[in-house]
C-alpha cells in the first residue's frame, strides 16, 4: 500500500521536474552576476578594482619614497660637519627641526663663499674689534689649534663675568616683543643678558673651525660683551616696560655706545654673530667703457659666422645652395650591406642634408628632435636607424622569446602617411630575410589586423595613434610584444603632440619601456611642442635644426602668392585658376586643399560637373577608396586632387606643379605643410592662397614667408555661367552638409568664432554662393554646443 503511494508520488515529482527542466531556456541566454551584471560588466568592474588597487599601491610607494628623501635631507642638515660621518650616522632622529637648529642652518648659508655679496651694514661689524678678552684668554689659546667648542667658551666666560653681571637662567632663542629694530637682540629684563645665546657664535662651516683668526675674532666679541655689556642701558620703546631708575641712570653717551655695540654684534635672536662681516669688500670704480664697451663690428661678424646652419655647411663643401643632397654617400656610414644593396637598387646613392645631419646621431642610439623642410628625406632618415636597430637587437637576442618582439614603433597622424612609410620600409628590407613591416591603421577590420600580426613577421610596426591604442586596450597581446621595444619614432611630431593627439600618445608611451631610443621628426616645431617633447625624449637629447635659425621654412623654388577676393566668388575663381594653369602647364598636377571634408566633396562635385579630370580624398571616404586614389595620383600626371588636411602632411606626391588652398588653414604650420606637397626633392612649384577679405588677419602669421599678393583675375561671363549651371546640378544634401561643415570650422577658429552674429551673416552669404535659397536648420543640441542658439540667421530644427 505504502509502496504504491510512494511510487506514484515519485513519478509525479519526476514529471514536474522534467517539465521544468524542459521549459528552461538553455544556451545563448544572458548570464547574470550579482547585482544584475552581465559577464562583461563583471569583468570590467574587477579590472577597474585591480587598477585602483595598483594605483593605491603606487601612491603608497611614492609616499614612502618621498618620506625617505625627506629623512635623508634632514639627516644632512642636522649632521655636525666637525664630527665626520660617525656623528651623522649616530644622529638618526627624524623629528621636526627646532627653531634654534633652523636659525643655525640659515646662518650657515651666509658664511659660504660668495655670500659676502648679500651682507649689508646691519649684518655686523665691517672690521675686527680691537678689544680682546683679557681674562679667560689662556683657556682659549689652549684650544686655538682645535675646533671651537662654543659651549665651553661660554661657560668660561660666564664664570669670569658672574662677579659683575647677573645672567638670566632661562634660555631664549627669540623675542616676543617688538622693542628693537631689525637684526637687534632682545633679553629678558633690562640689561640682563643670556650668556647661552653666545652659542650662536659657533659657525657651522668646517672652514671656520681651527683657524686662529676666527678664534681671535670670537675672543674680541666676548671682550666687547664683558666690558660694555650688549647695549649698555637702552631706553625701551613704545609698549615696553621700564623703571624710572633705568631711565634716570641712562646718559647720552651710554645710548650711543649701546647702539653701536648692537650694530656690531647683530641679532642673537635671529642669526647671532654668524653673519658678522670679517672683511670689508672694496667696491672697485667701474668706468663707463667697462660698463658699455664699444661694439666691435669684426667681433659681431665673427660671432654670426659661427652660427652656421646646415645650409652654410653645405656651401663650404661646395654644394649648390638649391640642392637638397650632400656630398656624403650612404656607403660611408655604418649601414648593413643588404640595406646598401637595396638603396643602390633604388638608385639612391647620396644622402640628403637631413640624412647627413641626423644619421650619425640616430645610429649612435641618442634621442633627437629633428626639424627639416618638407620633401627632404625625413622618412629615410628614421627608417634606416630603425632597420639597423632591428638587426642589432636580433643578433644580440638571447634565448627564444615566448612572443615575437616588436623592436621599432613608428607613429603617424594619418593612414595614408603610415601606408607610404610602410612601402618605403619594405623597399629597404628587400634583401633582408625574416624582418617584416606591418601597419595598424583605421578603416580595416580589427580581427584581420590581429591575424596578420600573429601570422606574419613584424619587427617594425607603423601605426596611427587611435588604432594602436585600440589594440593595446583590447588585450590583444600587443602590449607584451612592445615591452622589447628599442626605438620609438614620432613622425609629424608637432601634430601628434598637439592637444588633439597628445592624450592618446601619452597612453601609448605609458605602455612602452623606458630604456629606449626616441626620435621626433617634423617640418615645423613650435615652442609649445618643443616643451611637450620632454614627455618623449630624454633630457640630454639632441636638437637638430636643418633649416637654420632665421631661415625660411618653405622651399626657395616654390613661388607663393595670395589672392584676396570676396568669399562668394571662390567657387568661380577656383575653376578659372585651374583652367589657366592647365593651359600654361602641359604636364600639370594640382592639389586643391579645402577646409573640411564636406566642402571638399562639394568642390570635387563642382569640378567634375565642369568636365575636369579630378579625384577626391577626405576623412569621410572609406579607406580602400583613399588608398586607391592616393596611389593613382602618385603615378599619374594631368590630374587634379581635391582633398582635406588628410593629405597635408608627409605625403610624397611627386611632380606637383600647383597647390591651391581655399580658405585659411588652421594655423601657420598647416599652411607650410600644405605648401610642402610641391617643390619636393629640390624641384620647383607654385602655391596659391585664396582667402576672403575678413580672413586677411591670417597674413600676419605668414609675414616672414615670401608671400606675394596678386590681384584677383577678371572672371569671364562664360565661366560664371558654367559654374552656376554646374552648381545647380549638385544634390541639395551635399550643399547642406557643406554649409554645416563650413559653419562648424569657422566657429572653431578663434578670430571668426568670437562674434557669433557676424559669423551667422558670413554663413548666410556662403549659403547663397553655393545655390541654397535659405540656410539649412541646425539641431538644437548642435546649436547649443556651438553657442549659436538664439543667434539671428541660424535656424534651429524643431
From Swiss-Prot:
The gene is RH48. Residues 132-148 have a biased composition (Low complexity). Residues 76-100, 117-148, 236-257 are annotated as: Disordered. Residues 359-543 form the Helicase ATP-binding domain. InterPro entries: DEAD/DEAH_box_helicase_dom, Helicase_ATP-bd, Helicase_C-like, P-loop_NTPase, RNA_helicase_DEAD_Q_motif. A motif (Q motif) lies at residues 328-356. A motif (DEAD box) lies at residues 491-494. This is Probable DEAD-box ATP-dependent RNA helicase 48. Residues 577-726 form the Helicase C-terminal domain. PROSITE patterns: HELICASE_ATP_BIND_1, HELICASE_CTER, Q_MOTIF. It comes from Arabidopsis thaliana (Mouse-ear cress). ATP binds at residues 372-379. Keywords: ATP-binding, Helicase, Hydrolase, Nucleotide-binding, RNA-binding. One of its GO terms (molecular function) is RNA binding. It catalyses: ATP + H2O = ADP + phosphate + H(+).
Amino acid at each position: 500500500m505504502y509502496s504504491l503511494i510512494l511510487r506514484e508520488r515519485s513519478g509525479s515529482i519526476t514529471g514536474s521536474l522534467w517539465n521544468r527542466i524542459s521549459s528552461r531556456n538553455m544556451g545563448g541566454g544572458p548570464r547574470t552576476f550579482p547585482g544584475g551584471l552581465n559577464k562583461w560588466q563583471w569583468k570590467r568592474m574587477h579590472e577597474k578594482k585591480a587598477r585602483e588597487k595598483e594605483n593605491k599601491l603606487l601612491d603608497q610607494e611614492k609616499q614612502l619614497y618621498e618620506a625617505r628623501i625627506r629623512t635623508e635631507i634632514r639627516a644632512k642638515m642636522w649632521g655636525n660637519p666637525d664630527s665626520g660621518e660617525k656623528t651623522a650616522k649616530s644622529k638618526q632622529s627624524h623629528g621636526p627641526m627646532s627653531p634654534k637648529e633652523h636659525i643655525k642652518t640659515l646662518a650657515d648659508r651666509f658664511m659660504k663663499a660668495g655670500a659676502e655679496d648679500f651682507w649689508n651694514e646691519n649684518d655686523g661689524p665691517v672690521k675686527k674689534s680691537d678689544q680682546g678678552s683679557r681674562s679667560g684668554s689662556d683657556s682659549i689659546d689652549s684650544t686655538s689649534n682645535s675646533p671651537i667648542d662654543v659651549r665651553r667658551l661660554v661657560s668660561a666666560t660666564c664664570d669670569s663675568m658672574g662677579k659683575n653681571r647677573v645672567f638670566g637662567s632661562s634660555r631664549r632663542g627669540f623675542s616676543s616683543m617688538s622693542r628693537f629694530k631689525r637684526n637687534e637682540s632682545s633679553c629678558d629684563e633690562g640689561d640682563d643678558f643670556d650668556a647661552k645665546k653666545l652659542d650662536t657664535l659657533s659657525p657651522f662651516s668646517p672652514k671656520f673651525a681651527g683657524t686662529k683668526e676666527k678664534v681671535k675674532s670670537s675672543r674680541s666679541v666676548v671682550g666687547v660683551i664683558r666690558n660694555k655689556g650688549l647695549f649698555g642701558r637702552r631706553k625701551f620703546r613704545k609698549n615696553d616696560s621700564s623703571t624710572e631708575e633705568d631711565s634716570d641712570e641712562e646718559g647720552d653717551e651710554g645710548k650711543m655706545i649701546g647702539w653701536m655695540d648692537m650694530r656690531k654684534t647683530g641679532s642673537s635672536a635671529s642669526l647671532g654673530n654668524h653673519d658678522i662681516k670679517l672683511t670689508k669688500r672694496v667696491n672697485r670704480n667701474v668706468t663707463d667703457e667697462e660698463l658699455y664697451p664699444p661694439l666691435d663690428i669684426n667681433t659681431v661678424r665673427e660671432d654670426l659666422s659661427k652660427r652656421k646652419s646646415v645650409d652654410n655647411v653645405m656651401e663650404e663643401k661646395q654644394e649648390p645652395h638649391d640642392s637638397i643632397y650632400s656630398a656624403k654617400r650612404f656607403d660611408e656610414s655604418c649601414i648593413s650591406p643588404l640595406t646598401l644593396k637595396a638603396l643602390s637598387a633604388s638608385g639612391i646613392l647620396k644622402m640628403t642634408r637631413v640624412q647627413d645631419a641626423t644619421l650619425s646621431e640616430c645610429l649612435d642610439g641618442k634621442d633627437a628632435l629633428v626639424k627639416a623642410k618638407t620633401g627632404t628625406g625625413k622618412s629615410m632618415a628614421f627608417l634606416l636607424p630603425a632597420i639597423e636597430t632591428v638587426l642589432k637587437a636580433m643578433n644580440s637576442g638571447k634565448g627564444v622569446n615566448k612572443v615575437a618582439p616588436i623592436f621599432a614603433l613608428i607613429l603617424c597622424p594619418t593612414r595614408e602617411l603610415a601606408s607610404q612609410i610602410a612601402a618605403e620600409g619594405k623597399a629597404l628590407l628587400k634583401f633582408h630575410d625574416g624582418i617584416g613591416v606591418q601597419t595598424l591603421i583605421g578603416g580595416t577590420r580589427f580581427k584581420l589586423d590581429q591575424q596578420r600580426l600573429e601570422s606574419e613577421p613584424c619587427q617594425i610596426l607603423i601605426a596611427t595613434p587611435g588604432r594602436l591604442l585600440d589594440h593595446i586596450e583590447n588585450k590583444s597581446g600587443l602590449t607584451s610584444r612592445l615591452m622589447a621595444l628599442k626605438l620609438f619614432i614620432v613622425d609629424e611630431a608637432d601634430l601628434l603632440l598637439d592637444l588633439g593627439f597628445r592624450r592618446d600618445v601619452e597612453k601609448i608611451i605609458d605602455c612602452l619601456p623606458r630604456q629606449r631610443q626616441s626620435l621626433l621628426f617634423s617640418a615645423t616645431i613650435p615652442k609649445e611642442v618643443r616643451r611637450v617633447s620632454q614627455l618623449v625624449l630624454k633630457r640630454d637629447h639632441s636638437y637638430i635644426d636643418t633649416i637654420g635659425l632665421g631661415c625660411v621654412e618653405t622651399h626657395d623654388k616654390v613661388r607663393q602668392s595670395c589672392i584676396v577676393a570676396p568669399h562668394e566668388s571662390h567657387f568661380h575663381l577656383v575653376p578659372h585658376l585651374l583652367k589657366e594653369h592647365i593651359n600654361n602647364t602641359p604636364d600639370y598636377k594640382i592639389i586643391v586643399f579645402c577646409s573640411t571634408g564636406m566642402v571638399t566633396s562639394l568642390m570635387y562635385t563642382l569640378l567634375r560637373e565642369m568636365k575636369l579630370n579630378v579625384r577626391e580624398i577626405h576623412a569621410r571616404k572609406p579607406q580602400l577608396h583613399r588608398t586607391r586614389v592616393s596611389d593613382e595620383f602618385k603615378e599619374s600626371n594631368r590630374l587634379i586632387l581635391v582633398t582635406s588636411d588628410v593629405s597635408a602632411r608627409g605625403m610624397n606626391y611627386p611632380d606637383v606643379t600647383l597647390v591651391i588652398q581655399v580658405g585659411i588653414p588652421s594655423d601657420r604650420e598647416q599652411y607650410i605643410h600644405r605648401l610642402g606637397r610641391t617643390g619636393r626633392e629640390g624641384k620647383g612649384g607654385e602655391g596659391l592662397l585664396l582667402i576672403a577679405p575678413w580672413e586677411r588677419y591670417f597674413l600676419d602669421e605668414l609675414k616672414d614667408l615670401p608671400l606675394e599678393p596678386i590681384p584677383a583675375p577678371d572672371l569671364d561671363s562664360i565661366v560664371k555661367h558654367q559654374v552656376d549651371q554646374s552648381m545647380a546640378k549638385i544634390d541639395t544634401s551635399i550643399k547642406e552638409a557643406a554649409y554645416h561643415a563650413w559653419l562648424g570650422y569657422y566657429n572653431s577658429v578663434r578670430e571668426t568664432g568670437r562674434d557669433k552674429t557676424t559669423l551667422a551673416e558670413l554663413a548666410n552669404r556662403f549659403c547663397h554662393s553655393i545655390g541654397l535659397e535659405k540656410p539649412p536648420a541646425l539641431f538644437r543640441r548642435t546649436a547649443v554646443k556651438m553657442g549659436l542658439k538664439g543667434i539671428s540667421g541660424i535656424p534651429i530644427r524643431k
